[in-house]
Amino acid sequence: MIEPGIVLRDSVTKTEAEDAGRVLVTGSHGGLYAANLAARARFRAAIFNDAGIGKARAGIAGLAYLEGLGMAAATVGFESARIGDAGDAWARGTISHVNGLAADLGCAPGQDCAEAARHLRAARMPESEPPALEETAHLIASEPGAPRVWALDSASLVGPEHVGQIVLVGSHGAVLGGRPEAALKIDALAAVYNDAGIGIDEAGVSRLPALDARGIAAATVAAASARIGDGLSTYRDGVLSRVNATAAA
C-alpha cells in the first residue's frame, strides 16, 4: 500500500486477494473491461487512466458502469500521467473525469490523483455483483499454412497458444510500469494495440520499440478510431497510428 487503504497496480489484471476493500489506483484504461475486473476484485473505489477518451468515449466508459454497481470511480488524464504506470498516476496524475459517487465524496476534475484517492477511502463498498464477462477472445482468421489472427480484449489474455500468431489487442500500447520486458508475454508474429491517445511521454506507444528489440512486428491503432478494451473494434474499426521498424520493414 502506498498509504493506508490505497494500493497502486500498473494493471487491474494484476491484483492481489488482499486488495479487496481498498482504493485502487491503476495504470489501466477506464473502459468497460478494466472496470469489470476492478468490480470483480472487490475494490472499494478506483482511479484509472482516461486513455485519451477515444472512440465512443470508451476510455472512460467504465465510470458510468461502475456507478451502476455502486462503485465510486475516476480517471486521470492521459496527458498528465503515463498509462500503464500507477506510480506515475499517483505522482503526477490529474483527475479528468469522475462519476457521481466519486463527486459526492469530493472528487473533481483538476485534483491531484493522490488527493482524490484519499477522498475515495470514504466510499461505501459496492453491494452489486458485476455480471460475468462476455467472450473476450475471438479467432478472426485460421487458414492452413498461415498464422492465425486473434482479437483479444486484453493483453492479459495472450497465452502460449498465440506464439507465432497475430494478436489484435484492445489494450493500450504502453509497457507496464515502464518495464520493456513486460511488453508481451510470448513471442507473437505481430501485435496491434490501442495507442490510448499516445499521451505524456508517448507512453501509449511504448510497447513498439520494446517489441522491435525482440523482432516482433507491432503497431497501434488510434484511440479515436477504435474502442479501447475491445479487440474486435481494434480489428474492425482501427486505423493505424504508429508502427515499429519491424512492422515497417
List where the protein language model places each region.
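Residues that scaffold, gate, or flank divalent-cation-dependent active/transport sites
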Residues: 1-249
